[in-house]
From Swiss-Prot:
Official protein name in the record: Protein BptA
Signal sequence coordinates: 1-19
Function: Virulence-associated protein essential for survival of the bacterium within the tick host and therefore within the natural life cycle of the Lyme disease spirochete.
Superkingdom of the source species: Bacteria
Family per record: Belongs to the BptA family.
Subcellular location: Cell outer membrane
Gene Ontology CC: one annotated term: cell outer membrane
Encoding gene (name): bptA
Coiled-coil segments: none
Keywords on record: Cell outer membrane, Membrane, Signal, Virulence
Amino acid sequence: MSRILFYGLLLICIFLGFFFYKQKENNIIYNRIVEKFEDNVVIDEIYTHLFKDSNLKELVFIKSQLIIPELEHKKMIKATGYRADAYKALSTVYRFDFKVHDNKILGFKSVIFEGFEDAKVSKHENNLPSEKWQQLKDFNIGDPNINEKFFHLEFPFVVKNTLCVTISKGFFKKIKKLKRLKIMLISNEDREYKIDIENFLPKYNL
């Protein structure tokens, strides 16, 4: 009996080891979060790439899907107007979050995707009404000066800055074709943070 229990525990350990290996394959940590409110569903698929040797600690890619059964009806899919158009624009949203640690609050005035230096960039706040997202060309980096009054301060602890970059469906399709993701962030202090990693996006059903 004890031998059967031992082999059973061993198989469980092997399975868990393989599971966590697959979850962290190529430095990518995968999470899936499903939230329900009333009859609606929000599904977030989150892919996190960890960095070890710089102030840039994480690159996080998030695909968010909003499912509203009422608007999924065939008649609504073909409909026009503010509500229908907003839902079409927001039902699937793609976003990169860049997490930078420093002893200061940072702003980021520029984001450059190598190969797409001429991309059309907007700089409006991420919480603006949905009609802004319908006008999204390539990607939005938010207002770089939203915390400007704090830029001069230095803190005796680590400040975890997050830059959220929302990208359009069309631009997502373009960067998905790249072999490598080469991205440069430029802060309000003209500090450059460079990323050069294998493009993990084509490996997943996004």
